[in-house]
């Protein structure tokens, strides 16, 4: 059995999610916003692993779903960075406020 209580995992996940949410809502740099979204996804993964390991009937379902979520997050980051590079070639800025128009 684990010596770390479940509340410690959940508290850490809440803190990580709140930091990611704060960064995603307040920062204007697109790269930082993508990193904050990844931080929020990692907090959700921590919850999945904690509940699957420390639940009443421990099984691998949460851990497998967490691996699936990590692969989707990697694809999301790759697509997001590709879009960011394409936008940066047309307009040399990475700020969210200046990327609200499609033509320009």
UniProtKB/Swiss-Prot annotation:
Per UniProt, the keywords (alphabetical) are: Cell membrane, Membrane, NAD, Quinone, Translocase, Transmembrane, Transmembrane helix, Transport
Transmembrane segments in this chain: where?
A: 4-24, 31-51, 67-87
InterPro entries xrefs: NADH_UbQ_OxRdtase_chain4L/K, NUOK/Mnh_C1-like
- An example of a Gene Ontology BP annotation on this entry? ATP synthesis coupled electron transport
Q: Which reaction does it catalyse?
A: a quinone + NADH + 5 H(+)(in) = a quinol + NAD(+) + 4 H(+)(out)
Enzyme nomenclature, EC number? 7.1.1.-
Q: How does it assemble?
A: NDH-1 is composed of 14 different subunits. Subunits NuoA, H, J, K, L, M, N constitute the membrane sector of the complex.
Q: What family name appears in the similarity comment?
A: Belongs to the complex I subunit 4L family.
What's the stated role of this polypeptide?
NDH-1 shuttles electrons from NADH, via FMN and iron-sulfur (Fe-S) centers, to quinones in the respiratory chain. The immediate electron acceptor for the enzyme in this species is believed to be a menaquinone. Couples the redox reaction to proton translocation (for every two electrons transferred, four hydrogen ions are translocated across the cytoplasmic membrane), and thus conserves the redox energy in a proton gradient.
HAMAP family documented for this protein: NDH1_NuoK
Name the record gives this protein: NADH-quinone oxidoreductase subunit K
